[in-house]
Amino acid sequence: MISPDKQYESFTNLYNPSEIEKKWQLIWTENNLYKTDELTENSDKFYALSMFPYPSGNLHMGHVRNYVITDLIARFHRFKGKSVLHPMGWDAFGLPAENAAIERGISPSVWTKQNISHMRSQLKLLGLSVDWDREFATCDENYYIWTQYLFLELYKAGLVYQKESEVNWDPVDNTVLANEQVDSEGKSWRSGAVVEKKLLKQWFLRITNYADELLKDLEKLDNWPERVKIMQDNWIGKSIGTNINFNLNTNPEEKITVFTTRPDTLFGVTYLAISVNHSLIKYISDQETIQDIENLKQYLKNNKNNELEKIGIKTSLIAINPINSEPIPIWVASYVLDEYGTGAVMGVPAHDQRDFEFAKKNNIDIKQVIINDKSEKTNELDKAYVENGYLMNSDQYNFMENTIAKLKISEEGVDNGWAENKIQYRLRDWLISRQRYWGCPIPIVNCKKCGSVPLKQSELPVALPKDIDISANKINALGDNNHWINTTCPKCGIAAKKETDTMDTFMCSSWYFLRYPSSKCSNKPFEKIEINKWLPVDQYVGGVEHAILHLLYARFFTKALRDNELFEIDEPFKKLLTQGMVQAAAYKNNKTGKYVSPSDINDLSNPTDPIDNTKLEVLFEKMSKSKYNGIDPESVIKKYGADTARMFILFKAPPEKDLEWGDTDVEGQFRFLNRIWKLYINCAKDINSKSNSYPDREKSLIKSMNIAIKEISNDILNNQFNTAISELMKFYNSLANSINDVNNTLKIEALKTFCILLAPFAPHIAEEIWHLIGFKKSVHLEYWPSFNAEALKEDSYELVIQVNGKVRDKVKINNDMSEDQIKELTLKRPNILKWTQDKEIRKIIIVKGKIINIVV
């Protein structure tokens, strides 16, 4: 890259980041500095990727942290000589854009594209080493045509199906939510509305077909945070157990199946509990019981977001325990879920705390069948006994260890036809149907004669209609657009209708990382050869909030498309970094529960509410408008420069921890960059003039330089960016203290090395000072320096002197001293003479580099 036409003949001590950053960003763009190099057989690759943003319209500090971290990693590996792919795109479909467009009375497409344009310009202010030629948005037709294509690939593989089911309905956003999009309080992850149940015909993906592989392959992800793997493990929720069939006493042909991981407690079953929608409900004839069940249904619906009472309704139904033929009463219970297992559970109050509490409340028998010790007698329990032990009250299994009895009772059940070994998962198939406009249309035609018919690739894309009606505070759903919906069946040719559901936005983000290596490919979603070269992503960076949704779906997509022979990779992301939140001080009035804007507070060191003079609590919380603690990245960049913002973000906290914003810390990084600027300005004035040369100073600088190279390299590889900057500061101090006392060759080498080490963190100022000291090509085209291990060796070491095993003195020893010289030196020391004088020295033991022990 050619240096800009500028002569550094007159220098200023003023560091002007705005001028420097604009200049270099323009030059980098003009020279295609960050265009991805083609991979060859001999080149190493590195694929660095941030989770792509939703184009909300404005960059926030959480974005800045995410993209600066990824950029640092990408730059480092480019310096290491690798071909780096570092792209950017936009997760552009979804309800927020649709709702924002409705509020403004414009098309979601227009709104989204405006936001993308603005956010792109904001991102470019950060000086990211992104290959912008590969940019796309998921709402682009030339992207979502391939989302539709991949949907059809999964359809052909039998992984897509449609069924009528009770779904999670968001009454505010008027759409269906996947289980993963409903929080623990039963509220929508997006709108916060209490989720309702509704019966609709929906499209699903069979993610459960991959449950076992998704679980097992977590073991391969050595470079993922353990907490993310645990979250996925728990969400998949594998249980190994037994399905046990209980016959109804009034109808022996009718079975009630329960899943249990504790067949050893089968003799202790004193009731069965079923859900309010279980198929056995039809056998209940008592009208009072039926009404109680209806009331319980309403209670469950109204209290979806609350902790449920353990409500039970005893029915007239009786089951028969298959192992001992005892009659077992059947209850309808509030805690039994329709969607998990069989919708029925066996109640063992003596050995399950939930069952124990339910039994106590409803006066159900409690029968203990496991004891801690064979000689122990049963007493009335005050809580469930849940430990291992020995069976009792269990016929031929009495006194058998319960861990063995589990297997034996299961075997008896399987042999006699009333049990089946079963693996069960908490994971449910992925519901992808959404009843809104702004999403990827599903490429299916509904025909009265042929049913649901998938389109051919040649008939794609099914494009969203542009003639939309924005009225009555909503955009009409696709089903209301007669011009768009009416079509002909691709199979039989009669009049038919397009599918009116759109896809969950996670469909688009489950494969976007596969598009970047061949983003301009026009006849398929990606080039197989490019996927096999570039994937998996070497470093993926994003928030832990995506641990279950996006990351699990992306893993599923990768495995499903692999099985369709579209590529050979098993996992999409080799290394995952989940960065913490960016927090800032928020001022809360605990009396009113309201937050107060810092601009309304007279004294931030002693904050009080200007309205009622109440002392305010200072909390560090995630930045948000409602808490008045948001920091605008553009204003920070305007005041201090992008390099300062980058340095602060990287230095303030380890990347996986939450970061607390502090103006003082930002100013500290700005001052550090100013000191660097002044040092290089002064050096540039007489870069070729001879300096005084002091060997001790030179040796010290060489050592500092090599320590910096070694430590910063290791810190970046280990995502310890804050300690890397600390090492950079140490090297700067050594450089500044000795720069005028070393020979010219070392001076230039040290200045050059510091510049390269600084460049991934603060790329603009590094580029500027690189050219200040006379280099013509970009610093970002240099190679990362290697450290010299010899330079790190000490000339001397501290030797501990012992007399009869007790420490009596310490002395500095040169590395080149012989054992005889060491003995002579230590024996002459006053502190040693007083312990050895007039005594016989029997033996001297030397552990080289550590200890000398004189035995007297």
Curated annotation (Swiss-Prot):
Top EC group: ligase
UniProt KW keywords: Aminoacyl-tRNA synthetase, ATP-binding, Cytoplasm, Ligase, Nucleotide-binding, Protein biosynthesis
Catalysed reactions, as listed in the record: tRNA(Leu) + L-leucine + ATP = L-leucyl-tRNA(Leu) + AMP + diphosphate
Motif ('KMSKS' region): 622-626
Amino-acid positions noted as binding ATP in the UniProt annotation, renumbered to this chain: K625
Presence of keyword Cell cycle: no
Segments carrying motif 'HIGH' region: 53-63
E.C. no: 6.1.1.4
GO molecular function: aminoacyl-tRNA deacylase activity; ATP binding; leucine-tRNA ligase activity
Localization, UniProt: Cytoplasm
Example GO biological process: leucyl-tRNA aminoacylation
PROSITE patterns: AA_TRNA_LIGASE_I
Pfam families: Anticodon_1 (PF08264), tRNA-synt_1 (PF00133), tRNA-synt_1_2 (PF13603), tRNA-synt_1g (PF09334)
One GO cellular component term noted in the UniProt record for this chain: cytosol
Chief localization: cytoplasm
Family membership noted in the UniProt record: Belongs to the class-I aminoacyl-tRNA synthetase family.
Name the record gives this protein: Leucine--tRNA ligase
Organism of derivation: Prochlorococcus marinus (strain MIT 9215)
Gene for this chain: leuS
